[in-house]
Amino acid sequence: MLQLLLAVFIGGGTGSVARWLLSMRFNPLHQAIPLGTLTANLIGAFIIGIGFAWFSRMTNIDPVWKVLITTGFCGGLTTFSTFSAEVVFLLQEGRFGWALLNVFVNLLGSFAMTALAFWLFSASTAH
């Protein structure tokens, strides 16, 4: 149990730092759409898609790796709370169209990236 907790801790910290770095780099590029959060969510969705595909095929992988990557890293990297706050800020500023676009791009993009990663990994490992 301690190993699992440590894996979540390390993965979550690493993912959070990666998200912060992406936000620092990409959020200033566009005032209406927080590109750092979008990038973090899309990358995280892609990584978790690969992870789930990989873990479903490789059943002998230590559970520590599973929680390090999915719950830890992807949980720290992706952020529904920041995304939600950014949408609320856009709404408060009266940017309703941008808020709606932000919701659709984040949600649909994340679903698409997870499905794409799962499909790509599954196709590349099919025998």
UniProtKB/Swiss-Prot annotation:
Keywords: Cell inner membrane, Cell membrane, Ion channel, Ion transport, Membrane, Metal-binding, Sodium, Transmembrane, Transmembrane helix, Transport. The chain crosses the membrane at residues 4-24, 35-55, 71-91, 103-123. Overexpression of pagP (crcA), cspE and fluC (crcB) leads to camphor resistance, chromosome condensation and suppression of growth defects of mukB mutants. Overexpression also increases levels of plasmid supercoiling, results in increased resistance to nalidixic acid in gyrase and topoisomerase IV temperature-sensitive mutants and affects the regulation of several genes. Na(+) binds at residues 75, 78. Belongs to the fluoride channel Fluc/FEX (TC 1.A.43) family. InterPro entries: FluC (IPR003691). It catalyses: fluoride(in) = fluoride(out). Disruption phenotype: Mutants show increased sensitivity to fluoride. Knockout mutant displays pH-dependent hypersensitivity to fluoride ions. Deletion of pagP (crcA), cspE and fluC (crcB) increases sensitivity to camphor and exacerbates the nucleoid morphology defects of the topoisomerase IV temperature-sensitive mutants. The keyword Ion transport applies. GO terms for biological process: cellular detoxification of fluoride; fluoride transmembrane transport. GO terms for cellular component: plasma membrane. GO terms for molecular function: fluoride channel activity; fluoride transmembrane transporter activity; metal ion binding. HAMAP family: FluC. It holds the Pfam family CRCB. It is found in: Cell inner membrane. This is Fluoride-specific ion channel FluC.
